[in-house]
């Protein structure tokens, strides 16, 4: 089953329907939540435990944890940070039960000495429903608590992290691990919230599958089982033409490497054939570099392909190509604009557009409404900013919503690169990637991704699933490369060279499971 990702509103609706329609009492859900937290807390064998309880049901979860842990942990103290009249009904109930169990409860905040002596802290102050900025004494306390760097387990989401955007609402607790319920929330996966979440554990506490896997939940997580299900098959009885012919239109004076990386990545991702359309003036340069790739020298200006190359390009597309990778290092001028326009209007196969191609596209964006084939755009936030005239900082704050909106408005697949990479399609579905690392922030990494996605389209995946699987395997390859090279020394060529191992690791991990 594909793991969905939800907003605070969507999770609240799931919670409400579980209670009101399916008839599972809220106290039962709270008990299950507490048991799941306790399971993780006991891994650390704490002796001195502090529970920070807020006014809502998140606080109730924390108090229930204290009751369950009473005979399992030497010293437990619950700090109820808010007066009883401000507590939710379920939180009041848990507080009443905890008192009857004889658990020490303090209304107020722990002092520095108490924090210092604790070997584990449960953060149950605020949950996913928090919308306002944390201010005043609570904010001051959180800053003090963070300075102690104590082992901290967050209930549902670290207090102060927006569950919808990952933004910090004034102040936030920095957790070592977070135990969330039912489904992950956006704020767990978007920065800076991801940094505050620590290791994320998603626990099933009894929400009906009809709710957690509902088709109206449009955002999904790309995990390895899902990725494996998308991997193109490789039958024993087959031929190179079965695995597609990628047409790479890329490269110009000073940027031949971009074209080479795109082509090489397409081959490493499994393409049967790859041909590069290159400026004839650079023919010797490309011939000195290629082995498995083929080149098609075409008419050119002083530095780039010329509009005179268009007839040969369109003939090749019509007769041989299964997918097109357009843009890496191709240059930016009127001739390239004419070529791209013609491809969008008349190409018989899908086009993946990146880098210089996106810069050119920003000048002719309205042509997308008449596109003849499916289009995949792979911008980083700066490139998307040029396309849609929205500041980069706003794109970073609303990665999911903006990618989703642009995909729908332009009728294209958007691969918004970054952390996390977001894939969105015109019908509103969105996928968040789970692989990749900071070492991949290096020149050429995007060219590699373009080649991979174009390759997967040529092998028969839909442009959407080619993008989803391509982003995952690209990140996994980068993760393998970083184990050997580290983050600082990793280059785009390393990602290409470890692609075969990424495919092996993905399949072996699944095959080795019991």
UniProtKB/Swiss-Prot annotation:
Q: Member of which family?
A: In the N-terminal section; belongs to the NnrE/AIBP family.
Give the co-factor note: Binds 1 potassium ion per subunit.
By its UniProt entry, which HAMAP family does this protein fall under? NADHX_dehydratase, NADHX_epimerase
Q: What is its EC number?
A: 4.2.1.136, 5.1.99.6
Organism of derivation: Thermodesulfovibrio yellowstonii (strain ATCC 51303 / DSM 11347 / YP87)
Q: Where is this region: NAD(P)H-hydrate epimerase?
A: 1-215
Write out the residues that bind K(+). Answer: 58, 123, 159
Q: Does the keyword Lyase apply?
A: yes
Enumerate the residues binding (6S)-NADPHX 1: 156
Query: Which keywords does this chain's UniProt record carry?
Result: ATP-binding, Isomerase, Lyase, Metal-binding, Multifunctional enzyme, NAD, NADP, Nucleotide-binding, Potassium
Q: Which reaction does it catalyse?
A: (6S)-NADHX + ADP = AMP + phosphate + NADH + H(+); (6S)-NADPHX + ADP = AMP + phosphate + NADPH + H(+); (6R)-NADHX = (6S)-NADHX; (6R)-NADPHX = (6S)-NADPHX
* NCBIfam families to which the protein is assigned, alphabetical: yjeF_cterm, yjeF_nterm
In alphabetical order, the GO MF annotations are: ADP-dependent NAD(P)H-hydrate dehydratase activity; ATP binding; metal ion binding; NAD(P)HX epimerase activity
Which cofactors go with this protein?
Answer: K(+)
A Pfam family hit: YjeF_N
Q: Which CDD domains match?
A: YXKO-related
Residues annotated as region NADPHX 1?
57-61, 127-133
Q: Please state the gene responsible for encoding this protein.
A: nnr
Q: Where is the YjeF N-terminal domain?
A: 11-213
Q: Which residues bind ADP?
A: 417-421, 437-446
Give one GO biological process term.
nicotinamide nucleotide metabolic process
Instruction: Tell me which residues bind (6S)-NADPHX 2.
Output: 329, 447
What is the role of the protein in this entry?
A: Bifunctional enzyme that catalyzes the epimerization of the S- and R-forms of NAD(P)HX and the dehydration of the S-form of NAD(P)HX at the expense of ADP, which is converted to AMP. This allows the repair of both epimers of NAD(P)HX, a damaged form of NAD(P)H that is a result of enzymatic or heat-dependent hydration.
Is Ligase included in the keywords of this UniProt record?
no
Q: What is this protein called?
A: Bifunctional NAD(P)H-hydrate repair enzyme Nnr
Q: Where is the YjeF C-terminal domain?
A: 223-506
Q: Where is this region: ADP-dependent (S)-NAD(P)H-hydrate dehydratase?
A: 223-514
